[in-house]
Amino acid sequence: MRVRGGQEAAQDKETSLDSDEERGRRGLRQTTLLDYMAGPAKPKKPEPPPTLHREREPESKYQNTLPETTGKEPASMSLRRNQPSSKHEEYNSESGDVRGLTLEPSPQSELSDDDVILELVREPWVESVRGYLLDVRYDGSLGKAVLMLYDPSSGSLVKWADRTGHKPYFLTDARPEDLRAAGVDVSHDESFLQYDLVEKFHPIDRKLVKLTKIVVSDPLAVRRLREKVSSAGFSVWEADIKYHHNYIFDRQLIPGILYEVGGVRIVHTLPLEMDDATRIVDEIFREEPREVRERAREWLRIFEAPPPKLPLIAFDIEVYSPIATRLPDPSTAPYPVISAATADSSGRSRVVLLYRDGVEFTEGALPEGTEVEIYDSERAMLLDLVRILQRYPLVVSFNGDNFDLPYIARRLEVLGVPREFAPIELKQDYATFRRSLHIDLHKLFGIRALQVYAFGNKYRELSLESISRALLGKGKVELKAPVSELNLNKLIEYNLQDARLTLELLTFSNNLVFNLIIMVMRTSKLGIEDITRSQISNWIRGLMYWEHRRRRWLIPSRGEIEKLSSAGARVGAIIKDKKYRGAIVLDPPVGIFFRVLVLDFASLYPSLIKQWNLSYETVNNPNCRDTIEVPEVGHRVCREFKGISNEIVGMLRDFRVRLYKKKSKDKSLREEERLWYDVVQSAMKVYINASYGVFGSEKFSLYSLPVAESVTALGRAVLRGTLEKSRELNLHIVYGDTDSLFIWDPPKDVLNDLVDYVERTYGLELELDKVFRAILFSGLKKNYLGITEEGDIVIKGMVAKKSNTPEFIKDEFSKAVKILSKLEKPEDVEAILAELRDHINTVYNNVKKKVYTLDQFAIKVMLSKNPREYDKNTPQHVKAAMLLQRLGLTLSRGDIVYYVKTRDKLGVKPVQLARLSDVDPGKYVEHVKTAFEQMLMAFGISWDDISGVRKLDRLLFDS
DNA sequence: ACAGGTCTATTGTAAC
DNA sequence: GTTACAATAGACCTGT
């Protein structure tokens, strides 16, 4: 039998690390392996039925090891806990007895306080393990990098402290004697370890350079010494890379895959080359050089490795608050946590409650299969909660970084638990557990690239409610009273629902989101806690840095890349508020067109990056002789060597287009495999779509304006060239935007000519995207309505489709669209127009008569900043927000304000304060007008031309 | 002083 | 990341 999770090793390690004090305590009662493993983390083991579940009791000896509480609670009560879940039926029938029961001491004790403490402070160190690498941390007290691995054989997370002797360092062009001569002899620094002479390839200078590696014992010393060295006029490199990242890059680790760690070796266990893998890769990359094909084979093994399945637990806490609308401040944690719910991936759910005078159970049933416990002592409750959470390798929260974790941590301090017994680590911008990993879904779903490319902009607000509504089709439990005033049944129901939603957001659709995270970790080479908290530019940075290290390339400094930027021809006129020129949007016609085909360039920008060898070191590099000029902007792209960005982007693009898009739809594969491949291709899509954007963003460490500028310039050239060719071929292009062309009723063979031309001339793939049976153009850019051959309706950019358009307009507009969808041939136009006219007349009258509800009149607009930060002017939604704030409601950045337009002087009112009689119909007529006009314009008529409307308007105005 | 007009800037949302 | 649109705020001008 296998050693379980290296637990034996863990014991050894503990002995060596423990202080005398801790050893002594363990002497009291040795925690058995079983105690530790008995947690719910073992997915296979069936859970005991709730009635058999018995919590360990009592906690009277707690005081021996933990300091006295601040005296807020009477000792006799604070240290005792009631009989748990098994009794909750009794509470139901005799709620009046809750108090009596809570004071009843339990007859049995299974776990002493020492065990509780031990479990809280113990760290699962191992010397060897076979497990999935999930993250790397830096442990300050050890002064070492620590691998966090999930061991599937024990179902738990283990830690492995570095034994490879890796140390923090940075690079400089100064030799040790130069530093001495310049009076910055860093070797006297207390953290200094040694100088190493290293040779690296400089990607811009295109030659090997000899550098001094200043090795230190402490990552903080890097920052300190870097300042010294650079202020003496020397160049420094790679000094701003976080140490735990440096460790991953240097050891060439791939988070998210299975490793065997032991001794000083960290070896991945990727599946050996599958027979057909070589064949597939050779086929896809047959035109690439040998090294690229070899790289591709390694990538393939990473993508093909199945994702880990690990036990997850989601949790959420509810805190008492005297002011219903305000959450207590986690930095002071002044009020008690009254409830905490957990839901795990094996289907188990628990709620722990704090006993409060006068707050009782009601008749209603409790959620099925849920273990409920009431505590007299908040401290015991929180410690138990943390203990349970820490048994899982991965804890999930919604906003845990900014609320739940800091609150619990601070609250435990307030309750007299010393910091070292509360295994929560509050980092600079996030919070986690000492022994578990933590994902905050609020941060994860706030990553814009995911929002847009992975979730198709389905949710707008970053709240648990709106995200789960959009992705799971269900929301939070609706409350009629503030959390602090709920009876216990409702509190349990509400709290638990939040925990369950949180869990489900990660696990729905066969672990879609979790698997996506794993895939992104593997690609970016960053740990799970980094990936889930950083924007895509950091993901790409991880991948690029890792790749630089693999090639033994020096990672250039911002300044070095910046220099190439100014070396460029730079002819483009400076555009106001913009850094560079973007894409072309063709002027659309006004009218209705039948049989319009849409062609688009498959991943235009990434393809251009690949085809044109665009990378920070290939554009405007003076160390390259053989260059080719980018039209319009005049940047010169190197042809002598292959760039790093385009190689990576090109590889991901090819994998996606040629392999994984197909695999995700391959019916011969098992459902689970297909879903995985869909995740793989989605992750690649996120990457390649962002690959162009990051070069134009200062936040990206390899920021290169010439690259971004060249991409868009080439995009324009390609679109223009294709347009010209279309004219030659007598194709009628009606519209186009960035990478698409709308062609009116083309002969089929001519279309093929165009596709061939694009392939030949630009090496790009032009694909048929859609065929519209009919399409309406309003004459506005990015604004059309089409009906495809299959009868699907495609609406782009129209006012009626925008999220800030009142609901009734959307409803009425979609009725109009239904009428329109009958449109098949030109002869239908007249009849349909007549029908539309009727409908619009009705709508007009309905608005004037206000037949809609207040909610339907609501305009929903997001606050892009906190209300007080609007200093230039005060938009309507901000005015409405301020009215709400006067009532004590706090509104902040990211919140959506619902308001109606009113007749009073201010002109707006939040829906919460408005009545239907406040609504100004005249202002809504204007709104309706713009919405429908975008449809009517295609028919060649304007709003005023709709007969009757004008008459009615006058009539109503006159009266 | 102020109503009503023009013009520009700000803001939010969407397409790509 | 840029391009594009709608709605509106606020500055400025003009006529009374």
UniProtKB/Swiss-Prot annotation:
Name this protein carries in UniProt: DNA polymerase 1
Basic and acidic residues bias (residue ranges): 44-60
CDD domains: DNA_polB_B1_exo, POLBc_B1
Domain of life according to the entry: Archaea
Substrates-to-products reaction catalysed: DNA(n) + a 2'-deoxyribonucleoside 5'-triphosphate = DNA(n+1) + diphosphate
Region (Disordered): 1-110
GO molecular function: DNA binding; DNA-directed DNA polymerase activity; nucleotide binding
Enzyme nomenclature, EC number: 2.7.7.7
